[in-house]
């Protein structure tokens, strides 16, 4: 087994090993020393929409020293696809909750993460129960990733208006946190309200699983700083990652981040294949975790095409040898 070490941020002179504090908001700090976590994306679609393949890939990633496996989500895909949309309508995607539960039940240490759930399309009371159950099944290994969504056809099919989806998402996050953490859950919001109820089991992680907000829009960045333990950017090269990390730090200097959220963990799925030098460039920007595509060298239209599971396993081994090795 290869340990998840060996990729570290460069030293930062005096005070090395400590994060910088940005006006009450602790953000992954460029130049600080920390272990880079490595995750694997798409554990629920394409090749891994087959349950046996998903389990094989997750177990192999766990044995290779990967820190986490991540699902993607669309409840429905547009057909025909709009210009620039690379996921074919025929792409099989296992439901996020089903996939996380499957993988959690067949692994023991690797974290299971939703990257991301399109939160405005969900019922937050039901989703809170589902995610709490995943956290129990996984013995506290859940990372709950949420996004506002962007596919209009998906919202129309679900009967949810796209307008106001960001406000709806924030309302839902507050409601789910109440269900996870309050002794007597009560919440009064714009889109969801409840009182006189309880919901068990509570998540294994107390007071709640870590929440990650996905997206690159200014509203998503602000939401991550103000409401979440982490931020997730998808398909980003090094320059774009640097721009967004800088925007997060600027927001951190302007906000009053709730102290209980702790440091904001920065996660990125890189655009294209990686080598050690490129990983180091992301690390220098303060990125805490890289979540790799199963076919990182494929062109965008081909990234979702099913491939033999053995090819994904070989890609995992390559990362373990070239990036995770000490």
How does the language model describe each region?
Residues 29-106, 207-209, 314:
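N-terminal beta1-alpha1-beta2 module of alpha/beta enzyme domains
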Residues 38-42, 69-71, 112-114, 142-146, ...:
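Hydrophobic faces of well-ordered beta-strands that scaffold small-molecule active sites
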Residues 41-51, 116-125, 207-216, 265-273:
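Active-site mouth loops of central-metabolism enzymes
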Residues 49-60, 127-130, 215-223, 273-281:
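Short, acidic/polar
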Residues 70-94, 118, 235-238, 296-308:
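Glycine-rich, proline-tolerant flexible connector loops at the mouths of alpha/beta enzymes
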Residues 77-85, 101, 110, 114, ...:
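Internal, glycine-rich beta/alpha segment that forms the wall or movable "lid"
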Residues 173-176, 241-248, 300-326:
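C-terminal helical cap(s) of enzyme catalytic domains, especially alpha/beta-barrels
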